[in-house]
Amino acid sequence: MRRSFFPASLSLLLCSALLSGCVVTNDYIAFDSKAAPSPQIKRYDGNEWASERAVMVAAEKTNNWQTVISVGNDVIAKNPTNVEARIYLARAFTKTGDPRQALRVLSFISGVDTAELRIERARALIALTDFEEAVKLLKPLTDGSDLQKLSAEDRRSAKSLAAVAYSMSKNYAAADKLYEELLAELDNPIIRYNYARSLYLEGRAEDSLAQLQPIIDQVPAAKPAAVAALMKLGRENDVRRLLKGELDDEKIEELI
């Protein structure tokens, strides 16, 4: 008789594979983490800010979000109107699990509407499961509207986040369209994983597995996601083969 639970050693990984109802995890939206702001944002080119910005950029590249937060707080304490610093700071708060603080940081910005501001607000809203508002913010950046001239990076970031929001709000057709566009532009393993996750939610386990197979060894969450898809399809022997060497035989049989 098939067991209806999963061993504790796999519970966190299987959460990433959608089995526990997780809404958004960092690896789900990690693709569009970036270190360079859009050219539309007002720059503060003083020597001190240039040095502080360099520290924040370097910290982002290594996911050292606490350094970004520390430096960003110092910067806006001295210059509350530094929009660029607020964007870095908001992104760091969302990445470290405090999206409400990210929105507070951005709420002090007025009279400015840029792609990056919309992207960071949407990122925080997605983390708060406010998918409808996130889609509204991102729609002008993903449907061809001329809100402003977008960089390729901003357009991909907007599409990536919008796809997450559509998927989590069960608008799978819209999510599929964006994921397919993204993968046609650039075959990115994180985007492929996110697409697989969306397909699983949609009930398309076979299609989800097809997206996961090329990235099993590239994205840590891909293997547990593949296990979830295989179990959904009743392919227990394939689960055993996939987990051989990862778990002992007894644990594998518990899982199955």
Where do the PLM segments sit?
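Short coil turns that delineate tetratricopeptide repeat
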Residues: 46, 80, 112-114, 146, ...
